[in-house]
Curated annotation (Swiss-Prot):
Domain of life: Bacteria
Lipidation (S-diacylglycerol cysteine): 20
Gene that encodes it: yidC
UniProt entry keywords in alphabetical sequence: Cell membrane, Chaperone, Lipoprotein, Membrane, Palmitate, Protein transport, Signal, Transmembrane, Transmembrane helix, Transport
Protein's UniProt name: Membrane protein insertase YidC
Length: 289
């Protein structure tokens, strides 16, 4: 569900980005500009001055700082996702049975009873549906900040990047084909790495994102200052490392924590993972006893 909601969100962001033009001074007004873009511009200028007018380094430091700030939210999301996935191994038969009751319900009372039964299933397997629903929260929290930085780099203000534009082999204030290609490739790899631990039914949407994300990145970067391509490249590189390590760690941890529940389930049902009505006791419930 989260992946399905991500595509419309991405398309909405593309429309928003295409509709905003801060290249002209008279357009640099309004709540969003004054709250996010202007403040992010001030931070970039301060960092650039702090690094002896090295604005490429300033962009890298700012991107890493933002990623580190939202890292706890992202790690919590990885953990909850893997725990939910492991518990679904034994919870799915019960959940499918209740979903059938919801579909067959003809009255409001029947639907309410079925929904209440679904909540009991969640409780039985120590699952919190709100954790899955809030999985996009880290993205929503960082989105205004990221978009503010996007406009700062796409439409640099006078001074700063425009006057001290040299970094590595490219000009931060002008489009650069190679940093554009690097950004596109890295975003493709980031989407690809995220599929490693996904169940087959979720991979189809991820494959679509694997194509759409790089195309969007390349399309925007070709007509933007190379500073934007640098930002996307650093961000994608960080996400590749973060995704790979977090998925490897939390996948193993989730399997270890849920293993006793799966073992108890299989013992009661003779190793069958499709039987219904298993008396699964979570770790939290064990502690209460």
């Amino acid at each position: 569900m989260k992946k399905k909601a991500l595509l419309p969100l991405l398309l909405g962001i593309m429309v928003f980005l295409a509709g905003c033009d801060y290249s002209k001074p008279e357009n640099r007004t309004g709540f969003f500009y004054n709250t996010f873009v202007k403040n992010m511009d001030n931070i970039i200028h301060w960092l650039g001055a702090s690094f002896n007018n090295d604005y490429g380094l300033a962009i890298i430091v700012l991107v890493l700082a933002i990623r580190i700030i939202v890292l706890p939210f992202m790690l919590s999301n990885y953990k909850n996702s893997h725990m939910m996935r492991e518990k679904m191994i034994i919870a799915k038969p019960d959940m499918d049975a209740v979903k059938e009751k919801v579909q067959r319900a003809r009255t409001q009372e029947d639907k309410m009873a079925a929904n209440q039964e679904m909540m009991e299933v969640y409780k039985k397997y120590d699952m919190n549906p709100m954790q899955s629903m809030l999985g996009c929260l880290p993205m929503l929290i960082q989105m205004p900040i990221i978009m503010g930085l996007f406009f700062v780099l796409k439409y640099p203000s006078p001074g700063g990047i425009t006057e001290h534009s040299h970094f590595l082999w490219f000009n931060l204030a002008k489009p650069d084909i190679w940093i554009t290609v690097i950004a596109g490739v890295l975003y493709f790899l980031q989407a690809y790495v995220s599929t490693f631990s996904m169940p087959p039914e979720q991979k189809q949407m991820s494959y679509m994102m694997m194509i759409i994300s790089p195309i969007m990145i390349i399309w925007v970067s070709l007509s933007s200052a190379a500073a934007l391509g640098l930002y996307w490249s650093v961000s994608a590189a960080f996400l590749i490392v973060q995704t790979y390590i977090a998925n490897a760690y939390y996948s193993k941890k989730a399997k270890e924590e849920v293993a006793p529940m799966i073992a108890a389930y299989e013992k009661e049902h003779g190793g069958s993972g499709n039987s219904k009505g298993a008396k699964v006791v979570s770790k939290k419930n064990k502690k209460k006893k």
